């Protein structure tokens, strides 16, 4: 728990320092998922600062020597509203997918920031797309309904869009964002 708290504190500081907005996150025992808005193309610098700073802190705190992270971070652009929604849901469902607990029971993801409205994550965009907190809860629950035998199936962009439209009573996500 302490390591996760230190990592989140560092993440918030580094994101602020590099003008990167956090959209969603989930800290897992062996990996981290981040969804960010990087308007100034600072993601690489932010990640370098975050990972090296956290590694130094971790090594000092624990007496560990050497690398803390196994590999360089991977990133990909998000080019549609549908994919954005799919990623937010995928990130928050990681603990359930790993058999740890339900998304709403896991304290090391941004799920609670969407529901409670506090924290380091910029929730405005996603909440506007899904109809606020109640829409977010319904949209998140739809991911649980897709589990079959404990295994998640990944949504295609069109499936994510169809799910969003169904959960939003026929409104398009892009229409909600424009409200």
Regions found by a protein language model. Give the residues of each.
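Short Gly/Ser/Thr- and Asp/Glu-enriched loop/turn motifs at secondary-structure junctions
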Residues: 27-31
